[in-house]
Amino acid sequence: GFKAGVKDYKLTYYTPEYETKDTDILAAFRVTPQPGVPPEEAGAAVAAESSTGTWTTVWTDGLTSLDRYKGRCYHIEPVVGEENQYIAYVAYPLDLFEEGSVTNMFTSIVGNVFGFKALRALRLEDLRIPTTYSKTFLGPPHGIQVERDKLNKYGRPFLGCTIKPKLGLSAKNYGRACYECLRGGLDFTKDDENVNSQPFXRWRDRXVFCAEAXYKAQAETGEIKGHYLNATAGTCEEMIKRAVFARELGAPIVMHDYLTGGFTANTSLAHYCRDNGLLLHIHRAMHAVIDRQKNHGMHFRVLAKALRMSGGDHIHAGTVVGKLEGEREMTLGFVDLLRDDFIEKDRARGIFFTQDWVSMPGVIPVASGGIHVWHMPALTEIFGDDSVLQFGGGTLGHPWXNAPGAAANRVALEACVQARNEGRDLAREGNEIIRAACKW
């Protein structure tokens, strides 16, 4: 029975007649094979290398049931308009993955295979997470409805502001900027993603001044205010220590950079936040390293799905209109994946699989990066009510300074929401609506 030697992957791992199971994790890869490598072989190689395969036939294959555990490439289609590029669909049996570990899921699916010689490039476009697997994750600490109830804010997007200059302010001046923005009418202020604990502002001092800012603004406005305290740190222990301190100060929300911090750290923090009533704001620093290339890497919708499983209440999702990249339909596709329970397959929006999250709470998308008051009508229309709109320079860059900048954003937002509720067309009349709002 046993013959050593190298053999074609497609003999074992390309199974076009396979019927996918409801418990399978399905992946859609954009495969660019090297010249001369047939697409079936390339697709099968991806399935093999990300599941049970190795480059040769091994004796120990006889000790397990490959049919039960192997990944299968079950469908291949050419990409329209691209030469020698294919979408390969791969099904992975549920047993290949550890329960409740995004880290393990990614190690399996994208761990090794991206350096594969037979491929010129490889991109993971989408994943279908079966409910049997997603149920092993706790997901977002609270979710959209709970957050609205905690903050007592309904029927409009939330407003945030990243404190700039992002690096260099002392703790006290930082807190002062927070206070002015919150007092002016924003719901949240935010630590920038790279504000952790540097020599010019240590985390504990910053947190104390920011908490003071929030309480003072809360007392004066009668609205609940929050500052995203960035708990990202060099070790998981230090990260939790910062989150504990935020809780002791009574802060409503903390923040984490989930890609640089890592999924393991992020999931730990999400569990802590759920147990202690903290909201969790997620920044996606480093995402473009992974998702910006069209032919290689991973699409952000995969990172977004992973975050919903790992846990976070807000996540940055591009703006469609600001300084950072993001196409409208694709962005709305993964915004729905973050917020909704059930998302239909829709290739025009980049959604390769129907995804059913069942009862897993949703994540609020955050639009942030180079947006300002004149983008407000577009943002209100694109993102709808369940979103956070964040204006950093768009608040602090106001010629009359921070509080008026914040007030301008709040007035513009309320005007846009009111106009929308009256049935006006924001896309067409947006500028007028904002001009009229300036007058009061």
Swiss-Prot record:
Modified residues (N6,N6,N6-trimethyllysine): 3
Listed InterPro entries: RuBisCO (IPR033966), RuBisCo_large_chain_AS (IPR020878), RuBisCO_lsu_C (IPR000685), RuBisCO_lsu_C_sf (IPR036376), RuBisCO_lsu_fd_N (IPR017443), RuBisCO_lsu_N_sf (IPR036422), RuBisCO_lsuI (IPR020888)
Superkingdom as given in the UniProt entry: Eukaryota
UniProt subcellular location: Plastid, Chloroplast
EC top class named in words: lyase
Cofactors required: Mg(2+)
GO molecular function terms noted in the UniProt entry: magnesium ion binding; monooxygenase activity; ribulose-bisphosphate carboxylase activity
Reactions catalysed, as given in the entry: 2 (2R)-3-phosphoglycerate + 2 H(+) = D-ribulose 1,5-bisphosphate + CO2 + H2O; D-ribulose 1,5-bisphosphate + O2 = 2-phosphoglycolate + (2R)-3-phosphoglycerate + 2 H(+)
N6-carboxylysine modifications at: 190
GO cellular component: chloroplast
CDD domains, per database record: RuBisCO_large_I
UniProt binding sites for substrate: 112, 162, 166, 284, 316, 368
Site positions (Transition state stabilizer): 323
EC number: 4.1.1.39
Record keywords: Calvin cycle, Carbon dioxide fixation, Chloroplast, Disulfide bond, Lyase, Magnesium, Metal-binding, Methylation, Monooxygenase, Oxidoreductase, Photorespiration, Photosynthesis, Plastid
Modification comment: The disulfide bond which can form in the large chain dimeric partners within the hexadecamer appears to be associated with oxidative stress and protein turnover.
Major subcellular location class: plastid
Role of this protein: RuBisCO catalyzes two reactions: the carboxylation of D-ribulose 1,5-bisphosphate, the primary event in carbon dioxide fixation, as well as the oxidative fragmentation of the pentose substrate in the photorespiration process. Both reactions occur simultaneously and in competition at the same active site.
Record family assignment: Belongs to the RuBisCO large chain family. Type I subfamily.
Summary of subunit composition and partner proteins: Heterohexadecamer of 8 large chains and 8 small chains; disulfide-linked. The disulfide link is formed within the large subunit homodimers.
NCBIfam families for the chain: PRK04208.1
Additional note from the record: The basic functional RuBisCO is composed of a large chain homodimer in a 'head-to-tail' conformation. In form I RuBisCO this homodimer is arranged in a barrel-like tetramer with the small subunits forming a tetrameric 'cap' on each end of the 'barrel'.
Name of the molecule in the record: Ribulose bisphosphate carboxylase large chain
Species for this entry: Bambusa multiplex
